[in-house]
Amino acid sequence: MAGHDVQYGKHRTRRSFSRIKEVLGLPNLIEIQTDSFKEFLDTGLKEVFEDVLPISNFTDTMELEFVGYELKEPKYTLEEARIHDASYSAPIFVTFRLINKETGEIKTQEVFFGDFPIMTEMGTFIINGGERIIVSQLVRSPGVYFNDKVDKNGKVGYGSTVIPNRGAWLELETDSKDIAYTRIDRTRKIPFTTLVRALGFSGDDEIVDIFGDSELVRNTIEKDIHKNPADSRTDEALKEIYERLRPGEPKTADSSRSLLVARFFDPRRYDLAAVGRYKLNKKLNIKTRLLGQTIAENLVDPETGEILVEAGTEMTRDVIDSIAEHLDGDLNKFVYTPNDYAVVTEPVVLQKFKVVAPNDPDRVVTIVGNANPDDKVRALTTADILAEMSYFLNLAEGIGKVDDIDHLGNRRIRAVGELLANQFRIGLARMERNVRERMSVQDNEALTPQQIINIRPVTAAVKEFFGSSQLSQFMDQHNPLSELSHKRRLSALGPGGLTRDRAGYEVRDVHYTHYGRMCPIETPEGPNIGLINNLSTYGRLNKYGFIQTPYRKVDRATGKVTNEVVWLTADEEDEYIVAQANSKLNEDGTFAEEIVMGRHQGVNQEYPSHLVDFVDVSPKQVVAVATACIPFLENDDSNRALMGANMQRQAVPLIDPKAPFVGTGMEYQAAHDSGAAVIAKHDGKVVYSDADKVEVRREDGSLDVYTIQKFRRSNSGTAYNQRTLVKVGDIVEKGDFIADGPSMEGGEMALGQNPIVAYMTWEGYNFEDAVIMSERLVKDDVYTSVHLEEFESETRDTKLGPEEITRELPNVSEEALKNLDEMGIIRIGAEVKEGDILVGKVTPKGEKDLSAEERLLHAIFGDKSREVRDTSLRVPHGGDGVVRDVKIFTRANGDELQSGVNMLVRVYIAQKRKIKVGDKMAGRHGNKGVVSRIVPVEDMPYLPDGTPVDIMLNPLGVPSRMNIGQVMELHLGMAARNLGIYIATPVFDGASSEDLWDTVREAGMDSDAKTILYDGRTGEPFDNRVSVGVMYMIKLHHMVDDKLHARSVGPYSLVTQQPLGGKAQFGGQRFGEMEVWALEAYGASNILQEILTYKSDDVNGRLKAYEAITKGKPIPKPGVPESFRVLVKELQSLGLDMRVLDEDDYEVELRDLDEGEDDDVMHVDDLEKARVQQAKEAAELEKAKEEALDKTE
């Protein structure tokens, strides 16, 4: 037997064909959300408060300090928040200290700071009753970036940018004359030496001393001449910079100094963030810059005077490692003191080294480092600016390298915690201005923190973020996999990110650093391709927001691949050679082959095994969760795999789902971590179990109660239904399944079913990817799903009186009210059809003012005679089903309702949808198709043992699409069915073709895995043997019931008077310009005239035509279409005198616009009137007939 058995949870064993021993299990798949939010509550929120506070008033006599904060218990439980359309949030209380510096008085007070939304255990937020997700954002990391560009003459120029988290950009660039310029915050450029002089190093010799002598420095100094001898060089430079930043304002050196300090050196205005400081120090670090250079001076220990490295030595990694302590210490550190006019006058510490120029051995180049400022220094320092300039000048000498902005070492993830912190900071900054003004205006003695703090800007910022940010999204809840994928999504769009239109190919493309961090396959098709990605299975974030992936460390001394796991970011990985997970190993853990396949900085090639530093942890670390659920992924073309991964997320939960016979072993973990199942929180023993709740007695005696959700409506309108898996007496451990969620079976994800599939054509019905299906799948409810739709009706106070929910509806038959209760609300369990009343409601009609007598009669006899309009909630087009639940909310019951609303009724209708012609089906390999025919079971082809086939697919759908995985799955699935086993074939480490054929033989199938099929209609065998097997097929969310639409009478657009478009508006089918050409080509003039007049926008014509049809008279000639009148009005609005004349030169009167209703859509009232009139006439006719009959009798 090929393969070995693996246990997944307590309910499923699979035969796995994996060969690679995985030393690291999958991490929790939603930790990117939960960990980030936890960190925000633990430290992030505190940091935001400490950033903005303390706040002083303008005279610095009062100060408001932050002490701490506390989150109290949430107001609603999760379930209550869902039912009441509320947010699941906890009140946050912040303690402030107000210090009066004149009197020394201190007031401490706790202030309510609004309700803060809390993340659920599933990694989601409940906002206004809807489950939402904050998508993590992929943005360019703060730091310093160097780039090169070739001009039209083929000359290479260099550029550099310091990008902060917030604050002004500082750019350097060269021009065609080899002069270096700087720009501050995208303004006009100035020679870079001007900025150096402003920083307090004004002499030309000083500048050459810092940066070394080079052509670029010399050319720039020549360009930067001393224009005004009355000013010092530093003052002149400061004025020049001020002129660029504030053109047209009077320039003084002092105002320029304070402006530059505010722009770059004030931590409140300029923030690199921890990650920016880390990236800056890393890039400007002397160690990386010296690597591979030849040192041009002796390096001497400043304390002992010992020569550490002699001049002429090449600085290899070993040499640098040997003097690493000294490089981090005081080796070659120089202190420069800026002059007294400088922007910042503190002494500047720089590290300077002289190396031989790579392109000219006779020249010496100076490398300047920033002496690694502390991580807590979040603003720029003078040393940072000088070191950046040095790196930039070194690039022209061939030292250092330019950056790739698409490298994942330069792109980082802003997860939910950071996005919330940024939003909170914006709110606090708005509040700060407010607080400062109140502190200055009001009487100091009586002030308390509560009085000067207005929390509205903060709560508004948070509310706005959750309600309307591009990154706050309604959770995709089609099935557990789509939930999980949504939580792991990474978007490059959103505030501070890219826009679809500006994103080019490079940003969207797969980069070698995506390996193990972002999935190269799962991304949407369409305009967002490559901008929205998914985290790989093992990816996680480090403290700076860079994605890390795990590798097994290779012990270079012994050559053994150890079980020690090291997590590396993309730029750390660039220094190593990494071998693939499937490299063959000996028993002792050493490489079995001298040469192994490996990667180094994007180069995939063979490397000697003794050079390898790390080995992949698992073959599936490359791909995302959805992609890892595709068996035989390695045999599919990547474009089809992309569709396969995306379509699994659109699977509809079925009534009785089945886990796949051929899985990848990922199904268990995906179901477990998705948040849709009920998972045991502690060890214990089941003491009670039914369909609605499970009770587990813990070892310490306490009781855990788990509620099971039954048929709740999910965000996407499908039934969210959980099924209990445990019985009384079962022992459960922490992490075990207590109940399956939707699309789960036995603790595994089960998106579809395992039908018997044949690759064969049948009467041409599976042309163009269509799917032929057996009626068995309809009768046995194999692909039946339940869909829940929510309808609501509310009663409001109108100017004419309150609306009412009632059974007493005007002009409605008793038959139509038969399912309503005494209040006028539909009963639960009623079967309703399109147009049935769900909630009877009447609205007062203001026709005339009542006289005193009528008012008296109303007071005595009740409101029966009052004029009311029937505004009942009815079942919309295509919404028929069974009433599943009714919820009533009133103020009397203590429910919170919007102002003006007195009562709210919600009705849930369940629809059972069987599969039908027009529904979309798909496999897991991007093989999608639409059901074209449902064939009676007796007519389907059958196997030699009499089993009829369930589905027939077109064999022509396979070769050109190159998704051969489906054929391998088909054969292995048949073998699994015959053997009665489940199979796991993990991606890139699954069943080989030998394993496949061994299993086929073991199952007793023919050696080619094909079979003879018999025609169900004739009983004759087909000419050729056919591939028949079991393939996992899913039903997708694109169902024909949601798309089917027909209109007879409906709403018209107000201006053009043409029917509206689209199913939602109950619109018509557009007969466009090209369709008109087609009818013109046929010469079908009468049909054309009808289409362009009665059926479209000839208002009077359509009314008369309706009347004529109902009375059986000939249809009159059409009039002028409304669109023609619109055209006339448009021409008149241009000042042209347009009139329409008939053939006798009489002017034709056109209808005026204000005859329609005062509404965007002109409804069908005219037709209604015509119908009522006709009904009256018919009734009178009947009456007359009856009377005539009476007389004759």
UniProtKB/Swiss-Prot annotation:
Disulfide bonds: none annotated. This is DNA-directed RNA polymerase subunit beta. GO terms for biological process: DNA-templated transcription. Belongs to the RNA polymerase beta chain family. GO terms for molecular function: DNA binding; DNA-directed RNA polymerase activity; ribonucleoside binding. It comes from Streptococcus thermophilus (strain ATCC BAA-491 / LMD-9). The lineage of its organism: Bacteria, Bacillati, Bacillota, Bacilli, Lactobacillales. It catalyses: RNA(n) + a ribonucleoside 5'-triphosphate = RNA(n+1) + diphosphate. It comes from the Bacteria. Residues 1177-1193 have a biased composition (Basic and acidic residues). PANTHER family: DNA-DIRECTED RNA POLYMERASE I SUBUNIT 2 (PTHR20856). GO terms for cellular component: DNA-directed RNA polymerase complex. The RNAP catalytic core consists of 2 alpha, 1 beta, 1 beta' and 1 omega subunit. When a sigma factor is associated with the core the holoenzyme is formed, which can initiate transcription.
